[in-house]
A protein has these predicted regions:
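N-terminal catalytic scaffold of extracellular/periplasmic and nuclease hydrolases
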Residues: 1-105, 109-129, 135, 202
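Formylglycine-dependent
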Residues: 89-91, 129, 133-148, 152
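Active-site regions of oxyanion-processing enzymes, predominantly non-cytosolic
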Residues: 125, 129-140, 160-182
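Phosphate/oxyanion-binding active-site loops and adjacent basic polyanion-contact surfaces
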Residues: 75, 153-161, 199-203
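Surface-exposed acidic, glycine-flexible loop patches that form ligand/cofactor-binding
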Residues: 42-45, 85, 165-171, 211-214
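Active-site His/acidic residue clusters
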Residues: 64-69, 144-152, 170-174, 178-211
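Short, well-ordered alpha-helical scaffold segments within catalytic/effector domains
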Residues: 40, 80, 157-162, 204, ...
Length: 214
């Protein structure tokens, strides 16, 4: 079923939580129960079992779907707290938008320095992101959300997918990778067939990278 615990029509927080944890929750929640108790995600289980883990998204990496795999919050829009949750995990690779919540925060916290202290290679240029072949990678492709494919995003999604696969593939135990083409959904919100189709075709290129890797 696709309904959330609070509404016949789900949202990305509740549906992302269902994908990440197998549990229903209320709209707007990020991997917590309707009452606010923490739910364990598949990414966290993978980490616990020695697998490498990664996230790729054409939105901000803090948007509801990717955040549901790594963060826990009753408010999907509490981006400042969601960013801090990234420092509480050992996720190996994440590539997407959202730099401002790590490096230009209103509370003055410098999460970029903290990421570097944890051993992450932090890059903001796609070519530099693609040059990373091992270790931990935090790739920021936009200050907030990435632009639409039709407005110049280019090959960010397939290239980010390929990079994540190559880095995570160094672990002989295996890995978990979540790749989201976020803006297919946004095209639906806009009731724009052109937007949906261009994003779907771009996502198909990312799927091709995954199939080639497999």
């Amino acid at each position: 079923t696709t309904f959330s615990s609070s509404n016949y029509i789900t949202d990305s927080g509740a549906s992302g939580t269902a994908l990440a944890t197998g549990q229903k929750t209320a709209n707007g929640h990020i991997s917590v129960t309707p009452e606010g108790d923490t739910l364990t995600t598949i990414l966290e289980l993978a980490e616990k079992n020695g697998l490498s883990t990664g996230l790729v998204s054409t939105s901000s990496i803090l948007h509801a779907t990717p955040a549901s795999f790594i963060a826990h919050n009753k408010d999907r829009h509490d981006y400042a707290s969601l960013a801090r949750d990234f420092l509480k995990t050992d996720v190996d690779v994440f590539i997407g938008g959202g730099y401002d919540q790590f490096g230009n925060r209103e509370d003055g916290l410098d999460l970029i320095s903290r990421l570097k202290d944890k051993g992450y290679q932090v890059e903001r240029d796609m070519k530099k992101i693609q040059s990373v072949t091992d270790g931990k990678l935090a790739g920021f492709t936009a200050d907030g959300h990435n632009p639409k494919f039709s407005e110049g995003r280019g090959d960010m999604l397939p290239n980010a997918t390929e990079t994540a696969l190559n880095v995570l593939g160094n672990n002989s135990k295996g890995f978990f990778l979540m790749v989201e083409s976020s803006q297919i959904d946004w095209g639906g919100h806009d009731n724009s067939t052109d937007y949906i189709v261009s994003e779907m075709l771009d996502f198909n290129r990312a799927v091709e990278k995954a199939m080639q890797y497999a």
